[in-house]
Amino acid sequence: MPVALVSGGNRGIGFEICRQLGGLGYSVLLGSRDPARGEKAVSALRGEGLDVSMLELDVADARSIARLGELERVDALVNNAAIAADRAHTDTSALHVPAETVLEGFQTNTLGPYRICQQIVPIMLRQGYGRIVNVSTGMAQLAEMNGRSPAYRLSKTALNALTRVLADELQDTNVLVNSVDPGWVRTDMGGSSASLAPEQGAETIVWLATLPDGGPTGGFFKKKQQIAW
């Protein structure tokens, strides 16, 4: 049975990603910083007959991430956990958000996936197969870049750069690495006014996590179509 690891899997898009991958026959490791919330999510998914286990994972904690290297198999990795650190400030312009807030965003949104990939990619290389999906945002798209929310925008833009770096380094392997803009999704982060349900937001992510051999790598996708960086 293939194994999928999803960070931030206890709610929102992450929870739906776990559900959809489980429905496709994956044994899902649901990463959650909060064990109680993680176990609650696992219980709900197991109630649907899915093979899901809770994995305590704080993507801002290097020691927590280091334990991932002990895993025996990971076929699909979805770097989904993220924070919108700018929301701690009333004025979210780049001239007012402190550098410390930007660093907080990078710690979770960029360095978290970076460290996770350092642990998981060797596992994928040993087994000769892997799919990595970095959940990004349209707010990181340089072609459409606007102002405000610098911690979120900059950290997610750097995550896209990580996708390109890894895809290049792994181009002669069967490990595919892509970024995705899930769209504006109704989650705690996206808010209740968002246009997409979590099921819709997860669809392209799951598609990228299950690409066939020879599929695209090093791309930025939305609605299963490649978009400009």
Which role does the model predict for each range below?
Residues I83-R87, D91-F106, Y114, Q118, ...:
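Catalytic loop of short-chain dehydrogenase/reductase
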Residues V6-S7, N79-N80, R131-T137, L176-D181:
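Structural signature of the Rossmann-like NAD(P)-dependent dehydrogenase/reductase core
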Residues L24-K40:
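Conserved glycine-rich Rossmann-like NAD(P)H-binding loop of the short-chain dehydrogenase/reductase
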Residues P35, L55-R67, A99:
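The beta1-alpha1 cofactor-binding region of Rossmann-like NAD(H)/NADP(H)-dependent oxidoreductases
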Residues M1-L29:
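Canonical Rossmann dinucleotide-binding motif of NAD(H)/NADP(H)-dependent dehydrogenases/reductases
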Residues D172-T173, S179-P182, G191-W229:
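C-terminal helical subdomain
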